[in-house]
Every structure is written in C-alpha cells, then in structure tokens.
Design a protein with these regions (language model features):
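Conserved Rossmann-fold NAD(P)-dependent oxidoreductase catalytic core, especially the SDR/UDP-sugar
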Residues: 1-38, 62
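Structural signature of the Rossmann-like NAD(P)-dependent dehydrogenase/reductase core
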Residues: 9-12, 60-66, 92, 118
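Short-chain dehydrogenase/reductase
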Residues: 27-46, 89-97
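A short C-terminal helix-loop "cap" of Rossmann-like NAD(P)-dependent dehydrogenase/epimerase domains
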Residues: 31-34, 67, 71-87, 138-149
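Conserved beta-loop-beta element that borders a ligand/cofactor-binding pocket
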Residues: 49-71
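Glycine-rich "substrate-gating" loop/helix at the edge of Rossmann-like oxidoreductase active sites
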Residues: 65-71, 85-97, 121-125
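Substrate-positioning beta->alpha
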Residues: 84-108, 114-115
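Mid/C-terminal beta-alpha module of Rossmann-like enzyme folds, strongest
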Residues: 102-171, 177-185, 193-201, 207-224
Length: 224
C-alpha cells in the first residue's frame, strides 16, 4: 500500500483479543491499557498493529469487541466455545450495523488518522457472558443455559472486557443500537424457521448444553 499513489488510507480491524482472556484489571479497558494476548489470534492482531503503526500510511486501528451475527441460518459454531469462559465475565457487545458505521465513518474522519480506537456498543451494551448467552438463546427461541455448564475459574476469563469508547463515539457517532434491536433483528432473520425452533426447543437446548465439557463435573461438585 505504501508504494501505491492512491491507496494510502488504512482502517484496520483489530480486536479485544489483544488484551487476552483473563479479566484481572479494573474496567473499562482503555486504548493505553497494556496488552497481553493469550492466543495466536490476539498475537497476530498485535503484530499487525505494530507493523501498521510503523508504516507511512494514513492509518487508524479500530479494536473491535464482539459483534454477534444477525443471520443465524447456516451459521456454524462449536457450542463448547460458549462454555469455555466464566459465566460472570464482563462482556460488551456491539450491533453489527453499528460496527459497520464505525468503520465507514473512520475512513473519512481526519481526526481518527494515527489513532487507536476502541469500538464497542457503549454502556447500554454491557452485560455478563452468561446473561448475554441466554439473551441470544431467547432471541432464537431456545435455552436458557444452566450456570453449571460454564467453566469455573478463580479469575474471570473472557477475551476483552467493558471498554472505554468515549473518544471513538465522539469522533464517529456510531452507537445507536442495543440489546433490544439486536434481538429483534435476529428474530426477523429467522423468519419462518422460528416456529420450528420453538417446537424443537427442548431438543435444541439439550444439544447445546451437552456440548459443555464442564457440566458433569460442576454438577458433581455442586451436589457433593
């Protein structure tokens, strides 16, 4: 890009993953909070950030929180991922449309050049991992997920945390939607499939919960 006479502007999608998956700091995470990636994804994002900051491009780095998919039909995921994080871990999401707005507006924002910005939904989008999972299950017509299905840890585990998005919101004015809008949009995307999901709710919920590798042990310990 540096050799191109025209392609000089770069808005890079980084991730909260660069902060690692241990919530051992007081929220919210700020742009200058020390990073500590704990997996290859986070380390790769951090390496990209470092290379971009050393370049001569007109760059902006947007560190994005979780943006749940609106269209779930055909979306493949491993249920075990849901349970690998502490149920009481802090989580801030963002509606995908708001995330798109942030990136689109960053392209033309002169004040954003040379800056790292946290991109999240704001205070109205702050919750816990377990609560958010159950809200998403509810939007699909299944669940809820039992607390015993989630890993138990001494320190909260989740990638990222609640975020300081004051500067990004001031520059980009993108935080418009919250949990209500997210659930409405998800239900609309389900369309005619929704009644079938509700009919099969017990079976689907059972299938998701059985993917937890922690459920049996947590219930054993809880009953002992």
């Amino acid at each position: 890009m540096q050799a191109s006479p025209t392609a000089r502007r770069l808005v890079f999608a980084s991730s909260m993953g660069i902060f690692g998956d241990v919530q051992d700091r007081d929220p919210p995470l700020r742009v200058d909070t020390p990073v500590s990636p704990t997996n290859e994804y986070g380390r790769h994002k951090l390496a990209c950030e470092e290379a971009i900051r050393q370049s001569q491009l007109q760059w902006s780095i947007l560190r994005l929180t979780g943006a749940p998919p609106i269209r779930l039909i055909g979306y493949s995921f491993d249920p075990r991922i849901l349970f690998a994080f502490s149920r009481n871990a802090r989580f801030e999401f963002i509606h995908p449309a708001d995330a798109g707005t942030a990136f689109a507006r960053a392209v033309a924002c002169q004040e954003a050049i040379g800056k790292i910005l946290n991109i999240g939904g704001g205070e109205k989008c702050r919750t816990t991992h377990h609560a958010f999972c159950n809200e998403m299950m509810s939007a699909m017509g299944i669940g809820p997920l039992p607390a015993a299905a989630f890993v138990r840890t001494e320190v909260r585990r989740f990638f990222g945390d609640w975020l300081d998005t004051e500067e990004s919101q001031r520059l980009l004015q993108y935080q418009k939607r919250g949990l209500g809008e997210l659930k409405v949009d998800m239900r609309e995307e389900l369309g005619a499939v929704a009644p079938l999901i509700r009919l099969l709710r017990p079976v689907i919920t059972w299938f998701v919960v059985r993917g937890s590798p922690y459920l049996r042990e947590n219930r054993r310990v809880g009953s002992s």
